[in-house]
Design a protein with these regions (language model features):
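Juxtamembrane helix-break-helix junctions at the cytosolic face
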Residues: 62-77
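Non-cytosolic membrane-interface motifs at loop->transmembrane helix junctions
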Residues: 32-34, 100-112
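Membrane-water interface at the C-terminal end of transmembrane alpha helices
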Residues: 115-128
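Membrane-helix interface motif
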Residues: 21-31, 84
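Hydrophobic alpha-helical membrane segments
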Residues: 77-95
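Core segments of alpha-helical transmembrane spans in multipass integral membrane proteins
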Residues: 31-66
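N-terminal signal-anchor transmembrane alpha helix
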Residues: 1-23
């Protein structure tokens, strides 16, 4: 179960990273609902650039996760705790520095994904 869950995380992270890199607006408006069209051209371009840079960070992490699954399976628990903490803590930062949007973006479920991943982490260390 843990192994297949790890593959789901890799797929999700690859998809998310590529969306931020290659989507015209980096997913900022089309997915997250940030009203780029109401911002100046320069401000919107800066936000899109930040999303693309974040996408490359996610892509690097995804490549490491893939390497762990393929070559270093004994590190899957470490991978799970890193992904869990990243999602949970990003959700915490979102409470402290929240986005002002009409609707919650899909990333709002990030803490839930983090908690599920944390549960799978505990399963993974119990199995070892």
């Amino acid at each position: 179960f843990v192994y297949y869950f790890a593959w789901l995380l890799v797929g999700f992270n690859f998809f998310r990273s590529l969306e931020h890199i290659f989507n015209e607006d980096g997913g900022a408006e089309s997915i997250a609902g940030i009203p780029l069209s109401t911002y100046s051209t320069e401000a919107a371009a800066n936000i899109v650039a930040i999303f693309a840079q974040w996408g490359f960070s996610q892509l690097v992490l995804s490549c490491f996760l893939l390497l762990i699954i393929i070559k270093m399976r004994e590190l899957i628990p470490l991978m799970l705790i890193i992904v869990a903490l990243e999602n949970i803590l990003r959700g915490g930062v979102g409470l402290y520095k929240s986005l002002i949007l009409e609707d919650a973006p899909p990333g709002a479920v990030s803490p839930i994904l983090g908690l599920v991943t944390l549960a799978v982490f505990f399963i993974s260390i119990k199995d070892n």
